Amino acid sequence: MIEIKGKYNSAKVFVDDYDKLEEACYKQILNLLNQKFSEGSQIRIMEDCHAGSGCVIGFTQTIVDKVVPDLVGVDIGCGMQVLKISKDFHFDLKNLDKVWRANIPMGMTHRITKHKFCENVNLDNLITPINKEKELLALGSLGGGNHFGELDIDDDGNYYLVIHSGSRHLGIEVCKYWQNKAIQYYQNHIKENSEIIEQLKKEGREKEIQSELDKLKFEKVPNELAYLEGEDLKGYLHDMEIAQNFAYWSRKAMQDEICKALNIKKKHILDEFCTVHNYVDIKNKIIRKGSISLYKDEIAIIPMNMADGSLIVKGKGNEDRNCSGPHGAGRLMSRSVAKESLKMEDFKKSMKDVYTTSVCVGTIDESPMAYKPMEQILETIGDTCEVLKIIKPIWNVKANDGE
């Protein structure tokens, strides 16, 4: 573990040494610690951390009285739905792939009709203005990027249907609306400062300008780190709860479609749980950006990559870690670097033991080689969770760039 200190706070980063922390990641962490909104909170960065868009991935922070919407970002409520299925059920992997593609929209596409689980999501209560009917048609669709459907198997022969997805376009709208609110809040303060300066100048009280500005306790912040507080913060958390619920039911809808199509019955189901890794834990007042909750005895999944599968773990409730853990292996290469440097031949070879029709140029940025090795994560997570099983993928599907 290393510690990084900034102007307003410090953060523990759960890597062995600075050599395992990329420079861009270090700079993002330091930038956050130099912002006023970080003051007084407990910030912990997970071992799978890497530089992200606007915020370091693997970030956790306890909420005091301020939140930056761009920290969680647009993929609100992104997580993984896991259904453990008895080894007595027979899977035909070729048919599973066919059934998935026939029933689950991927990439930019969405459903033609609304799924019945839309009744569990009340978009009418959103403060964020949206096209309700358009958003509801996205419930039950996978999306693109690193979102996937997967079938894994454990050492006992039992199966795990894993679905990784988020709140789709709804998350974009919610994040954009509230970050713009935060920027407007900041700009209003700038205007207020300017008016104070102008008034004091008119009155010949230039010497009092700095003392008056100091009373406001307001500092300049970049737009992407503008924060909400007070009633606006309450409004943001209200919308976050709805968007996170949307993401949950969207994954459940995809699971429902596959179970119906394959005739998976209750008697076949051994367990079911959900692990979210991009959200605000409203009950416990913790932000997790690329991090999962690991409260005591909580069962969770930590995916590694398309070839090596996932860890099934049980939380230890480590409060020094914000009761959190890594949400995956963490990227070793950015998407652009992966697309430029990785070869299709190596990608295909790494996936030889997994049935998939998704190994193509459009998904090469999700190649196993683009992620950190599993061993690096296993070395550091012992204080936050117990590894129960390592499950191996036998089928995987992802949207490619053209979908």
Place the predicted regions along the sequence by residue:
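Acidic active-site catalytic centers that drive phospho-/nucleotidyl reactions
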Residues: 47-48, 75
